[in-house]
Structure formats: C-alpha cells, structure tokens
C-alpha cells in the first residue's frame, strides 16, 4: 500500500484468519519527499512500479521469488528540462507488459515508457498533451485504447495506442 506522506510502501501478509499483518520482510522506503501514490505490477516479470506524486518520479522494484524486493531504477516522468510544478497522478501498463503510461496533473501530460522484455528496464519514449489536470486514466483490455479524464476538464479523451510503438494519437474528445 503506497503511503504518500510517509514515503513508504507498506507490505502485508494475509493470514488464514483473513487479517492483515505486517510483512516479515518489512516495508519499502522511497526517497524523502517522493510521495508514493499508486502502484502497478508487470503481468509477467515480477516488477512493481510506483508513481510518486510529489516529486514526479517513477520507481521500478523487482520482487524475487522469496519475497525480497529490490529497487532497480527511478526515472523522471516529465520531459528533460521541465521546471514546473510536479503532481503525479496515475499509472497503468498495457496488458502485454510492453508499455507503461503515467499521468501528471501540473503539466497535463501523459508519459510513455517502454519496458525491456528481458531486463525489465524502463526507457522514456514520449510525452503527450491531454486533458487539463489528468487525474485518472484507463487502458482497455485489448491494450489499443487509453481513456483519460481531466480534473479541470469537462471532457473525456480517447487516445489510440499504436501496438508496435505505444505512441498515442487522439481519436476523440467528448
């Protein structure tokens, strides 16, 4: 569970009594002031991604079979040289695990990252303008469409996802 104000991702186990208990391997700590907000899990490789709301970063962690989790990388969600406010919002992967998207409210951008299928490493690929203050978005089950709403918008935007590249193209806004 991502705990924004504590800069920690809490881990739990579920007992036979249906009660949660702290995980014996402990919690995951993020950078001070990062503000972990949302988590996503890769469908195949055991990687866990954390969107940090307050510093606009994206962390990748790897979960080993024994339950140990190690930090692998931390990337900026915004374009190189971006100097404005940071306010990360949401994170989703395509169902095939090849692409990861984040939304950032202050810049009104969706960011695209490629996921290396061998190592799991993230590569920043592109940034796309979208609805003002994009608080939430979803990717359809086929992985061909991304639907986004803006906190400061009356519209919903539908972006098509190019299967080979993950690039977004605006299909409609209503």
Regions flagged by a language model, labelled:
Residues 111-160:
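C-terminal hydrophobic structural anchor segments
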Residues 12-20, 61-69, 113-120, 159-167:
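Short loop/turn segments immediately following beta-strands, especially the blade-tip
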Residues 21-28, 69-77, 122-130, 168-174:
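Beta-propeller fold detector
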Residues 1-4, 42, 50-54, 102-105, ...:
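Conserved beta-strand positions in repeat-built beta-propeller and related beta-rich domains
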């Amino acid at each position: 569970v991502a705990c924004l104000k504590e800069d920690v991702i809490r881990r739990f186990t579920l007992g036979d009594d249906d009660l949660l208990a702290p995980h014996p391997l402990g919690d995951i700590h993020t950078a001070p002031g990062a503000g972990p907000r949302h988590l996503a899990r890769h469908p195949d490789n055991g990687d866990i991604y954390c969107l940090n709301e307050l510093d606009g970063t994206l962390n990748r962690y790897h979960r080993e079979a024994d339950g140990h989790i190690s930090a692998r990388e931390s990337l900026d969600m915004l374009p190189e040289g971006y100097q404005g406010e940071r306010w990360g919002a949401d994170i989703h992967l395509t169902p095939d695990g090849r692409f990861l998207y984040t939304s950032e409210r202050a810049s009104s951008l969706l960011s695209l990252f490629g996921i290396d299928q061998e190592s799991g490493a993230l590569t920043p690929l592109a940034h796309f303008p979208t609805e003002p203050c994009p608080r939430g978005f979803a990717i359809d089950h086929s992985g061909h469409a991304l639907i986004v709403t803006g906190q400061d918008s009356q519209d919903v935007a539908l972006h098509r996802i190019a299967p080979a590249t993950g690039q977004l193209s605006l299909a409609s806004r209503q």
